Regions:
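Transmembrane alpha-helices and adjacent helix-loop boundaries
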Residues: 2-384
């Protein structure tokens, strides 16, 4: 019965997260329909969705696996460049919906492959060493993409890491990737509903994974790696599963993010982006998916909302970060939050107590009945 109650609590929590995302979508639609949508808010919707997906996916590695990764922006850039490269070339010959869908799939696949290439050697490390290597891999990919020149002419596709003149393009040739300038002339596809659908897919995958046998193995590795190894768990397999899954969804987020702009440059995906996403996860609570989502929304919108307060923007931003950290970590505030949640869920707890009382009464009645039957049997034996 305890397991059933725990399962019901988990299901209720998961449904609340899905409900929050749907309500968020409905509120934005209502704002848009009533004509209160500002250009600033409209421009933030897709980045908010992308960062929510990034925070949820990084939580797999940092929160549930317990490993510090500082290269999450690299997976985002791998997905963005792979997906947008297809979208701006072969995608032009397809219906837009099909081109966007294939761009997402290719972006996720590219990020997953890069995640495997990085994860297989790197996940043998841990702690600071893992953080340093993932950070370095992200910077390496950023520099490679910044030096990448790709062109196309009647002879085919030409690639160079030197400059565009070394491509040897014919007069009818066209530059596809211009080094540090990246990919230009992207036909923007900014669809908030697509972003919400991606969040729901990410949530569904991560929650199902963490409630599965593989998810329990991942958290067991986080809690005690030595004990997990002693039980016969394949640590490399489960670590790689979490790492590559996070990379794939970061790739999806990269495609979503890149489709919101008319150009794509590698410098957007530097180590600062990885740190920002990590801050979202830490402030929301490591292993707390809902908290990470809230932190992603606040930390994406807040800096833009404070641009009018140029002199005090960083001060206010810092205060908000400190308050969020205290709210999540300070023992007194944690206890207050738990009491508040207990009051909100008071009816559910009373119902559970009634069930427990009924169960206890039932078992006590059965126990008394059994004792009476035993006493009667002993009386019969004595008479005989």
């Amino acid at each position: 019965m305890a397991n059933n109650k725990k399962m019901k609590k988990t299901t209720r929590s998961n449904l609340l997260m899905f409900g929050f995302v749907i309500i968020f979508w409905a509120v934005i639609q209502l704002i848009s329909l009533t004509g209160h949508m500002t250009s600033k808010l409209n421009g933030l919707l897709i980045p908010v969705c992308a960062y929510i997906v990034m925070a949820i996916s990084l939580n797999l590695v940092v929160g549930f696996l317990g490993e510090l990764s500082l290269g999450h922006a690299a997976f985002m850039s791998a997905g963005a460049f792979a997906g947008i490269f297809f979208y701006t070339t072969a995608g032009q010959m397809l219906p837009k919906a099909a081109a966007v869908l294939i761009a997402f799939l290719l972006g996720g696949a590219a990020a997953g492959i890069f995640g495997i290439l990085v994860g297989v050697p790197v996940l043998r490390l841990s702690g600071d060493y893992l953080a340093i290597v993932t950070l370095a891999s992200g910077e390496i990919l950023k520099n490679v993409l910044s030096a990448l020149y790709v062109g196309k002419d009647s002879a085919g596709i030409h690639i160079s890491l030197k400059d565009q003149f070394s491509l040897g393009l014919a007069p009818d040739g066209k530059m596809l990737i211009k080094g540090a300038m990246g990919i230009l002339g992207i036909q923007k596809f900014s669809n908030f509903t697509v972003g919400i659908v991606l969040i729901l897919i990410t949530l569904a995958y991560v929650l199902n994974l963490m409630n599965s046998r593989a998810g329990r193995a991942i958290t067991a590795i986080r809690d005690d790696e030595i004990a997990a190894r002693a039980t016969g768990l394949n640590l490399t397999h489960y670590k790689l599963l979490a790492f590559v899954s996070a990379a794939v969804f970061a790739g999806f987020a990269g495609v979503l993010y890149a489709l919101n702009y008319s150009s794509l440059v590698a410098d957007k995906f530097d180590y600062n982006l990885s740190i920002n996403v990590l801050v979202m996860v830490v402030l929301g609570g490591m292993g707390n998916i809902f908290g990470g989502m809230i932190a992603a929304i606040l930390l994406t919108i807040l800096p833009e909302m404070l641009r009018g307060f140029s002199q005090y923007r960083m001060f206010i931003y810092s205060i908000v970060l400190i308050v969020m950290m205290l709210f999540n970590q300070a023992p007194a505030l944690v206890a207050w939050r738990q009491r508040l949640v207990s009051k909100v869920k008071g009816e559910d707890r009373n119902a559970e107590k009634k069930v427990e009382t009924a169960d206890a009464s039932y078992f006590e009645e059965m126990k008394n009945k059994s004792s009476e039957e035993t006493g009667n049997e002993e009386s019969v034996k004595e008479e005989k």
